[in-house]
UniProtKB/Swiss-Prot annotation:
Cytoplasm recorded as keyword: no
Disulfides per UniProt: none
GO biological process: cholesterol import
Species name: Pongo abelii
Stated role: May be involved in the intracellular transport of sterols or other lipids. May bind cholesterol or other sterols.
Cited Gene3D superfamilies: 3.30.530.20
Domain START: 1-213
Record's keyword terms, sorted: Lipid transport, Lipid-binding, Transport
MF GO annotations: cholesterol binding; cholesterol transfer activity
Domain of life: Eukaryota
Protein name: StAR-related lipid transfer protein 5
Length: 213
């Protein structure tokens, strides 16, 4: 992928993520519990929903980021039940790459294994926040693979945010914005994301404790 185009695209995605983060209008809460809130609103990108999760994770910002960051050989594959593989297709800079993520079957196998090819940008902000910003791309080195339905992530990612005066806690805001593709009943998709996002936070908390205590 052309580096200049990749840089331009990724900065546009990061800007869109900031808009999602700042925009408080139109969100409807669909799941709450254990300190985690999941809400949604209709996507402007595809005929589906944009989901937003927010919760406090007990761990320093760097510890939490270490568990969620997109990295080959990283911890995410070890604890996230919705990720079975992560590979770099093209490394563009230290903070920008094209990746392939594979996911297992889900929802009692109604959702078959998926894979996603994304342009991913990591950004650090002046207040200490670290964000991962991703969107789907096509890449000649990663055509569709047998055994996987190719899904498409629209602008998505997460913000690991410091909590002033509480260095051992991190506010994690996540955005899931995924077209799972294939022929899936909408009610299956609508019930899958809020449940899986709630589990994501619970499993992440266990991972921070397991890998960083």
């Amino acid at each position: 992928m052309d580096p200049a185009l990749a840089a331009q695209m990724s900065e546009a995605v990061a800007e869109k993520m900031l808009q999602y983060r700042r925009d408080t209008a139109g969100w409807k809460i669909c799941r709450e519990g254990n300190g985690v809130s999941v809400s949604w609103r209709p996507s402007m990108e595809f005929p589906g929903n944009l989901y937003r999760g927010e919760g406090i994770v007990y761990g320093t910002l760097e510890e939490v980021w270490d568990c969620v960051k997109p990295a080959v050989g990283g911890l995410r594959v070890k604890w996230d039940e919705n990720v079975t593989g992560f590979e770099i297709i093209q490394s563009i800079t230290d903070t920008l790459c094209v990746s392939r993520t594979s996911t297992p079957s889900a929802a009692m196998k109604l959702i078959s294994p998926r894979d996603f090819v994304d342009l991913v940008l990591v950004k650090r902000y002046e207040d200490g926040t670290i964000s991962s910003n991703a969107t789907h791309v096509e890449h000649p080195l990663c055509p569709p693979k047998p055994g996987f339905v190719r899904g498409f992530n629209h602008p998505c990612g997460c913000f690991c945010e410091p909590l002033p005066g509480e260095p051992t806690k991190t506010n994690l805001v996540t955005f899931f914005h995924t077209d799972l593709s294939g022929y899936l009943p909408q009610n299956v998709v609508d019930s899958f994301f809020p449940r899986s996002m709630t589990r994501f936070y619970a499993n992440l908390q266990k991972a921070v404790k397991q890998f960083h205590e």
